[in-house]
């Protein structure tokens, strides 16, 4: 409905250009918003106020001219001017009912699909050689949710798990294995079964011994140069580490697979060419032995230029080098229209610099959109970054296990007579869903406080509340026998039916915001509001005890659409639904 009103306004603006009311080359981004007060209609635009200056008319006069020029539409019952020149649209109830009727048998719930694009999504991307921790949660689940929404809307999505499988940490592991083998021979291999402790011991040696640190850096260069021994060990480290990652992905219900892994090492053969191409364009400068690029737009507080380091003095490469190679690959080989990076907000400057450099060096097509969709931090209840009681990093698998234990206690307390197998399965879904939803429901760019107590509550905007809301709606159909809605028609008579219908009709525009802005929290808020709208409808409008069969079947269709929308919305967030709680 929103897109329909935008289309009417675009046609009106085009007519204004032809009539000379506004310049022929005038461009405007027409904004249509949902009204907060239903007495002001369903949708509103400030187009008249946007055109005041170029048209040389007062906004109310322009608003009336817009109304007079609008093409006729069966969807619009009436149009009014409000305040200084807002234009309010009242949607025809029968047109809304028709829109909902079309959604009943449509796998996309009546959503008009956009022109498909090829979208590369870079998310999760943990550094290998150690276990995933809570700091990896946000990129992994926010990225996965946006990927699901993109695919649902018909886009071609290429997942890229740009794991950190190259660099100093592998030099440390190689050097440590070298030391252990010198002492223990091939038996040293057994210690790799606990990669986390192996990494911790290597890091301790790196920090304590300058000689060890030098050797580790040398081994990184040898690894990057293709040394056979280093590469064999490196593959073993990677395989063990990736196995840990994919156990976590499976537990989280994340759609990443081994086929999606395209880490830093994938671009190793391209790094030398990146340096040569930048040099050939006269972009490289030598600074303290390193090869760097300075861009005029990037300076520090003192006004000094900030470098993008491309190659270190010892010949090693950095994140910027592999990022540039990846951007070129994603533009020229994968033919991406958009590339989305779900990486911590603290990396904003890095991405601004490399995006700018990639365009400057013509490594990427001009029409390809590079987007850093950064996120804030997950903090403990003290407001500081989430840590263990001893101050250590919380392993993601430990967090999920605690969520499962707490969810099991909660579900058991509410269902003391339920069998253990069912309890365990419900607790698994509730625990994982609670962790994911608590994160996804927060604005991506905000920091948030992690609280098991809040996320496992059945009140408010939480996973348990929405999972229960879905079972409540779906439960209606368990009480109906011989249901046949094939000839049923949606009719919106009661105010609460209209409110629910309006909310259901917004699903498409909500998903557009999720994929355009990378904001799953908008979908979470919508699902919470939809559950509330259904609750109000259910209290005011008897479904199974309706006045007649036509009314009952109409309300059953509204309930069915609500259940499908809740289920699809939760699934797009990567959350399973339950048939009982």
Swiss-Prot record:
GO terms for cellular component: cytoplasm. It catalyses: tRNA(Arg) + L-arginine + ATP = L-arginyl-tRNA(Arg) + AMP + diphosphate. InterPro entries: aa-tRNA-synth_I_CS, Arg-tRNA-ligase, Arg-tRNA-synth_N, Arg-tRNA-synth_N_sf, ArgRS_core, DALR_anticod-bd, Rossmann-like_a/b/a_fold, tRNAsynth_Ia_anticodon-bd. Its EC number is 6.1.1.19. A motif ('HIGH' region) lies at residues 126-136. It is found in: Cytoplasm. Monomer. This is Arginine--tRNA ligase. It comes from Shewanella baltica (strain OS185). The gene is argS.
